[in-house]
């Protein structure tokens, strides 16, 4: 072999510089979605995988916060420079005008938030192009590929921006249930509920990015304005318009003793309402994240079950719900809510924001509760630390819910059919 006459693959390799593996196209997540192989449960696993990936990335703490703000808002502003409204129909033109006005207003209003998130380490070297076509399901795990390499400004972004692209892609494909499942599980895994302040901005931005890409493919961009509007671009414009024009969100409280099925039901409500969820079982442990201290039940009145710690947990849940509601997301607070004063915090919160407050009262006979707690302790497959002692304390120390508390109360039995429960909540009870 010579430089002028190289031969490839003629001899056994001595060492690989780069060894690539060809993947089956059916492994792409867009194909999995089309084939019905991407559902709620593995979307939760996908979200947890992405959250884990984001948490391993070193934050960028040495850049100018003003530059980070500009990096967040400039692409969103520029989207509208690359679209000529005249090539779209009248309705799409009106939507574009509304979206642009909203984007400019939000870019200004959120500038302090973008700066604060940059200072807190939310800006990291992310994937940058995280949508379904750039994700694989291989050998039971999720594998991202084709990350952005050519432009550092497109990959050094807020982790909320990274996940927003995938959530928007699911919305665009008509799967709002999976989109909210993804966002909800991502938030529960990393605890970054503050990201909800900017999440809608990034969802709209990512939708407009895809509108620009679709327009360019159809010859609709400013550079080549000839051609009629392509449905793809208008579809993304419609999605962005829907994200901008959100109805008043609702606050849903799960209520009941440990083992009554609150989390089981809220797992189904997240994609069904749809809504985002905060769980007391996760939030009470959040301060210990990364300390290496193994989670364990410390007993009634001790550790995380001290009265002041319980108040702190409910306060954290309320803060997260406030952030989500103010950002236009339906929120579910999954906790026992056995004390009237804790319920009142959330009723007052909803009232202050003009939101409805619903309480879903999950009930079960005491023997069923005790059996579930026993089986949970044996399997150890639940985030709850509640044991028999905690349950017995709850059964003797609770404030019954009354109509005077100002909530819409729905009582649910432990043996209710899950599909019927969801239909009752969403349709007859008119939550959605």
PLM features: residue spans?
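Hydrophobic positions on the alpha1 helix immediately C-terminal to the Walker A/P-loop
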Residues: 265
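The conserved Walker
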Residues: 257-258
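Hydrophobic anchor at the beta1->P-loop junction of P-loop NTPases
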Residues: 254
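Conserved substrate/cofactor phosphate-moiety recognition/catalytic segment
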Residues: 270-329
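ATP-dependent phospho-/nucleotidyl transfer catalytic cores
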Residues: 5-132, 136-250
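Conserved lysine of the Walker
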Residues: 262
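Small-molecule kinase domains that catalyze NTP-dependent phosphoryl transfer to phosphate-bearing small molecules
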Residues: 378-426, 431-432
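A glycine- and Lys/Arg-enriched "phosphate-lid" helix/loop adjacent to the NTP-binding pocket
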Residues: 289, 296-308, 351-401
